[in-house]
Amino acid sequence: MRQGARAMSGRGWKSVAGTVALLASAAAVAAPVAAPAGGDGLYFPTSLTQAETDEYTRYELLAPETASFRITYEVTATTAGAKYFYNPIRKGSIASDESVRDARLGTPLHFEVVSGTQARADPLMPDADPATQYIRVTLARPVPEHGQARLVIVKTYKDPKSYYQDGTTLVFDRPLGVRRNKVVLPAGYEAVGVSVPAQIRTEPDGRISVSFMHAGAGAAPLVVRAVKDAQVGSAALPQAPGTQRSWESPFEGATEQERLAERAHQDRDIVYFLQQPETHAFSLYHDYTETRAGIDGYANVVRAGSVASQPSATILDTGEQLKVREMSGAELVASGINVGESVEPAAHVVVIPFTPLKAGETLRLRIAETYTAPVSYRLEGKELVFDRSLGRPRNAVVLPGGWYCTFSAAPATLSQLPDGRVRLDYWDDRPEAVDVLLKARRRIEAH
């Protein structure tokens, strides 16, 4: 159930703030060229050079004697009008078995390996390294204004300096600049050392994997060590996760399946833009990828205590604007729209219908709306107070113009928009929601 732009998964209202980090791929890579029109409205970064977001990499370690690993790199190009995307081949690595597909349709895309000099000739890549080779991908369509082009790049690297054996121990030692990653060990290996905080999971085929979201600046200093003493074959296959909820009091917890889901690969993110606190209002947008064949709608349940207005929806892959309908849960059932989940009959729901997905297709949606929530967002004396539980792995809150942060109960990184507004980013790598209690005061010049 999607409730009030929060990913609800039976977490209750646990007050646990996980590790947090800057949404660097959108904020640091994209160099904004224009500030918002004014006020405290939505802001979308723009760039004249190549920019990307939502990066996630899966490293599948092959037999250690090969010094090779298979990379699946999910990335979203965001530069409006871009027809190509360039992916560097890391120095010291020998690339082979490359392929690229369009994430929306699942269809292959044309690509070629070019030199850094060739890449630099493209206005998208003025800073391309002449000594580096690049995979140049021809996009299925130019990136729409404020839209996206989602890609999946697959390749095999051979790199003895990154992946080697130390006696009987397998070592994967590789700084990773992408913020969300998974490393899958070869069959029969168990992890005995991981240098960054990570989820330990078992893949459906029995292989052990480590998955993490990087919570610091710069590359993650990842070192994974593993030894070959784990089960293989049917003995290694994971038991199906249970549906019984956690017994932990005082709240009913999430199911085992929800708690063990890979956080780093979850691609639901949200940005709140606080209006002046006297209004109790905040605009927001949240992005969501639908992957289930036959689904022909998205339902967002308005959280109790909030009033939603001005809803809109866009297919980021194409820039197409979708019609938005507001209805009750009972009316949703009567409409026949398949949103893939049940909704309480009395619930107030924002529904976005779309063409049913075919097998192998995916759809990336951006939903924008304005909420009024006096309990969550208010003015207490001279202090702005934003008190709201946020359930996505990647959350951000932008203060209204003229305000500065005085308290943030949950750790956050701070950055500044071109118009001076302060943005706080909360990356939550734990399965519980992060309870954001944020306070701010007016800047001197804003009086």
Predicted regions located by residue number:
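Lumenal/extracellular ectodomains and adaptor appendage modules
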Residues: 31-447
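Bacterial N-terminal signal peptides that target proteins for export
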Residues: 4-20
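N-terminal signal peptide c-region/cleavage motif recognized by signal peptidases
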Residues: 25-26, 30
